[in-house]
Amino acid sequence: MSSSVAVLWVATSSLNPDPMNNCGLVRVLESSRLFSPCQNQRLNKGKKKQIPTWSSSFVRNRSRRIGVVSSSLVASPSGEIALSSEEKVYNVVLKQAALVNKQLRSSSYDLDVKKPQDVVLPGSLSLLGEAYDRCGEVCAEYAKTFYLGTLLMTPERRKAIWAIYVWCRRTDELVDGPNASHITPMALDRWEARLEDLFRGRPFDMLDAALADTVARYPVDIQPFRDMIEGMRMDLKKSRYQNFDDLYLYCYYVAGTVGLMSVPVMGIDPKSKATTESVYNAALALGIANQLTNILRDVGEDARRGRVYLPQDELAQAGLSDEDIFAGKVTDKWRNFMKMQLKRARMFFDEAEKGVTELSAASRWPVWASLLLYRRILDEIEANDYNNFTKRAYVGKVKKIAALPLAYAKSVLKTSSSRLSI
């Protein structure tokens, strides 16, 4: 269930993955060859730490709002204090926020006019425009709603978001695509090495070239990209999560990372009085909310794959087990359990809304639209009487269309759902 894209924050709703491509990339990752025989072919159609000092009040407040089951600080068997998943993730947030603040202090920094660093591209640099165009085609083909939202952005931001989307999609395809059975940890190691080269301005193919150009233009940190790959490693070896702390880390890896990747491109409103750190916290919260929504929507589908993406300790507290999920029967125990899970996801959406209002004007509308639509999936789960075993909750076309003017109003008025609602 490694849904990796949430319109950037949010394109998780649009993933319909295909392998990163069917032109030999898996073979290249498994071998020592430098180039795939058809590295620049079009994607085929198919399926879907520098440690800062911690604020104890921040840990306490987030734990209370989000309902984290475990304590913030945990003693290891050796007596050392281990960081909770939220703390580990927050360290990445601080690092990215510091990078953006450093760029903003530079008088030469302008998101839409800054010239990129030179990117070493196999062949002619004139292919860079074609690379971005291809990324746009992939978005249009597999994430139609998200793609339309990107058209509201400035041309430079739009292209950069396309490039990030495509990289996330290709990464997700490693473990969720048709070739997933051939992927090994070594293949992911090679994919990460390729990422490192990309950030050094040495892309492997034309789609990598678009992202290499993007990270040269914008203050995007490499750590969220590494962390997404770590999420793919987790999916290869893990199908159960003992508590919400474990699940939170997984959700960050496969979806929260996308928010950290994309906010430097989307930009923060110059008039915003919010701290950069708080905006990134909200972006992270939206990624977590989207992934939790995916998990709650796809319980039955995941169970048929032998996977349970629900906290084992909370299932036990509700008098439930994996066997109940595999049986697929909606009982009062299941309804009560689901009510608590939906409540938690909505709390993350609430936290995310605080940051959407602080984004640049050109980015707010598409993010609001995606947030509102994804949040409605939780309502549909309730409407299905919590039957997420045999029914897949989705938002119909009429409701999608109805959400657009509301999202626009929110983006203009810079308000949250507490003042406007569907």
Curated annotation (Swiss-Prot):
Q: Which InterPro entries does the UniProt record give?
A: Isoprenoid_synthase_dom_sf (IPR008949), Squ/phyt_synthse (IPR002060), Squalene/phytoene_synthase_CS (IPR019845), Trans_IPPS_bact-type (IPR044843), Trans_IPPS_HH (IPR033904)
Q: How does it sit in the membrane?
A: Peripheral membrane protein
Q: Which reaction does it catalyse?
A: 2 (2E,6E,10E)-geranylgeranyl diphosphate = 15-cis-phytoene + 2 diphosphate
Compartments it resides in:
Plastid, Chloroplast membrane
Please state what class of enzyme this protein is.
transferase
Q: In which pathway does it act?
A: Carotenoid biosynthesis; phytoene biosynthesis; all-trans-phytoene from geranylgeranyl diphosphate: step 1/1
* Keyword Membrane part of the UniProt annotation: yes
GO biological process terms, alphabetically, are:
carotenoid biosynthetic process
Pfam families reported in the protein's UniProt record: SQS_PSY (PF00494)
**Sorted alphabetically, which CDD domains does this protein's record hold?**
Trans_IPPS_HH
E.C. number(s) listed in UniProt = 2.5.1.32
Q: What does this protein do?
A: Catalyzes the reaction from prephytoene diphosphate to phytoene.
Quaternary structure per UniProt? Monomer. Interacts with OR. Interacts with ORLIKE.
Q: Kindly provide the name given to this protein in its UniProt entry.
A: Phytoene synthase 1, chloroplastic
Q: Which organism is it from?
A: Arabidopsis thaliana
Ranked from the top, the taxonomy reads: Eukaryota, Viridiplantae, Streptophyta, Embryophyta, Tracheophyta
